[in-house]
Curated annotation (Swiss-Prot):
Its EC number is 2.7.9.3. This is Selenide, water dikinase. Keywords: ATP-binding, Kinase, Magnesium, Metal-binding, Nucleotide-binding, Selenium, Transferase. The keyword Transferase applies. It comes from Pseudomonas syringae pv. tomato (strain ATCC BAA-871 / DC3000). Its cofactor is Mg(2+). It comes from the Bacteria.
Length: 344
């Protein structure tokens, strides 16, 4: 009998941990030319937001994003599901609604059979179906490692659009998914994942961030982004720096997957964690190693990081509960201090 194919053995990176580090990305973008200042471009790359938004008229904008990566799990169908869920998330993070997607596929055709790639596409299509959008086409290339993702188009009302740099002092921070995706998937790749933890990370990575569309319609939601490859601290630095504020994070209140402390102690910390910290660690007040290993953990298809005004909290929590989310605050935003983020 043939051994089952383990997709993670065919790639050097995994999921959003494949991202080029913020520090290196700065070097790449610094010499790439200035962005065209089109007044219809409501959101571009200046704030490192989740997606671009271009005006259709005075009230509506088209939301455009793309995301792709190498396998973070061995099962091809699940890889397709995770990659698609992660890509569509950027539309929800802007407060928008997805309209359609096209696939991006890189495949080592001389190494892995096309039937495996078909399962990846099937997984991606299943998620598009769940999101209520067509997978309308795509593009494929022969590549040395498997790569899959989507380019997604959505729409948003200008009054409901949520950016990552518009929070105000006094806002309360919420996170809709637990941290630890990178830690548990690293443990799985090293064959150290305990039986009781099997499937935990996969199930969270396959959970669509559809609540973002509802949160976008709440006036009390001042800013929103999704937590992906740069870890919670990386995306929180972007949110705080962009608004000229400091985020004060309550480490004990941050949701985390069961067993993360065990796996950190076992050395199951992905390489992206340290790359993340090296990129933005100077913007963060002193951390313990344990705090760094969790808070800089690269998330794939992570949750929404939401900044909510105090007067909008009750409505926000009511909507979250209606959507099946039991959320607790993880920190606050305050006037700028020495660092962009403080952890206590």
């Amino acid at each position: 009998m043939n051994e089952p194919i383990r997709l993670t053995q065919y790639s050097h990176g995994a999921g959003c941990g494949c991202k080029i580090s913020p520090k290196v990305l700065d070097v790449i973008l610094a010499g790439s030319g200035a962005q065209n200042l089109d007044p219809k471009l409501w959101v571009g790359n200046t704030s490192r937001d989740d997606a671009a938004v271009y005006a259709l008229d005075d009230e509506r904008g088209v939301v455009s994003t793309t995301d792709f990566f190498m396998p973070i799990v061995d099962d091809p169908f699940d890889f397709g599901r995770i990659a698609a869920t992660n890509a569509i998330s950027d539309i929800y993070a802007m407060g928008g609604d997805p309209l359609m997607a096209i696939a991006i596929l890189g495949w080592p055709v001389n190494v892995l059979p096309p039937e495996v790639a078909r399962e990846v596409i099937r997984g991606g299509r299943a998620v598009c179906d769940a999101a209520g959008i067509p997978l309308a086409g795509g593009h494929s290339i022969d590549a040395p490692e498997p790569i899959f993702g989507l380019a997604v188009t959505g729409v948003v009302q200008k009054k409901h659009m949520k950016r990552n740099d518009t929070a105000q002092a006094g806002c309360v921070l919420y996170l809709t998914k637990p941290l630890g995706i990178g830690i548990l998937t690293t443990a799985e790749k090293k064959a150290r994942l305990r039986e009781e933890d099997m499937g935990l990370a996969r199930d969270w990575m396959c959970t669509l961030n559809t609540p973002g569309s509802r949160f976008g319609k709440l006036a009390g939601v001042a800013a929103m982004t999704d937590v992906t490859g740069f870890g919670l601290l990386g995306h929180l630095v972007e949110m705080a720096d962009g608004a000229g504020l400091t985020a004060r994070l309550d480490y004990a209140a941050v949701p985390r997957l069961p067993g993360v402390e065990h796996y950190i102690a076992e050395g199951c910390v992905p390489g992206g964690t340290l790359r993340n910290f090296e990129s933005y660690g100077d913007k963060i007040a002193a951390l313990s190693d344990a705090q760094r290993d969790l808070l800089c953990d690269p998330q794939t298809s992570g949750g929404l990081l939401v900044a909510v005004s105090p007067e909008g909290e009750a409505e926000f929590l009511a909507v979250a509960a209606e959507l099946g989310l039991q959320l607790n605050p993880i920190g606050t935003l305050l006037e700028r201090q020495t660092h962009a983020v403080e952890v206590f």
